[in-house]
Amino acid sequence: MSKKATEFQRKAMSWMYRGKEIFKPLNTGWIDENVACVREWVANIFFYRKGDTTIMIDAGYNYDRLAEKMSWLGIDPKSIHHILITHQDTDHVGAVEADSPGLFRNAKLYIGEIENRYLTGEVRRRVIYHLYKLPQVTINNEKVLLHDGQVLDIDGVRIECFLVPGHTWGHMVYLVDGKYLFTGDTLWFGADGGYSFISSLAEDNKLAVKSLALLEKKLRKRGLHPLFITGHTGWTDNMEFAFAHKNELCSPFKKRAHDPNALYDAYDESDDTEENSKSGYLKGVGR
């Protein structure tokens, strides 16, 4: 189903969100010496490199140019043995769905136990304020099911799992080596700071807001100040910026939250080039 879902999003969401000043993905490149990203239209997938190990965070769309753009970064798809999945929406799992080209067919997937209930068909994913149910996603890769607070060690990489539900029921956020927090679709960065992610795409907006507040509380209690790396709006190392509007929603059709620096149509990726991917580290926001 991922190829159809990918094509639907490319056409429908391009039209729906054009000019709304919502999506501001990073272009393909490196954030620093450890973290790289590939741009797939409005979305980013990430790679964490430590020694000889490269861990992938989310699997993006069923995207024809993924292997090409990974080559710009010097990353071979065959080197990916572990993929952390924040949630099961098609712009985060497309490359591992059953009808994908199979670039990562041998990789092990790590996904929240609650989120996996979408994959088993126990629950259905609802979007557009619950008006539309998405088709069930099918993934054949080996899976490791995760729980809130679980800590993993993958080839010397420490990964801590935070359950942050709301956008989906089992959305997981990953803290990698205590420094990088991959937030998926829990945070949306506007020009004036972070908001709870796009309201029309959430299972439960009240829960999403509550979950963000709890995440901030956990981080502050432990004195953690990671890089916040989002799925659609870049990254920041400024915690105050990241949680500036945690009690508010990004509501794209009400113009309450927008970013004038966002692309008019983020599905136009003509500026995402190999040359630009090698031109220096990608800049953060809120700095």
Where are these regions (language model features)?
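Metallo-beta-lactamase
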Residues: 14-19, 24-26, 30, 113-165, 169-241, 249-252, ...
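A cross-kingdom feature marking charged/low-complexity
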Residues: 2-12, 240-260
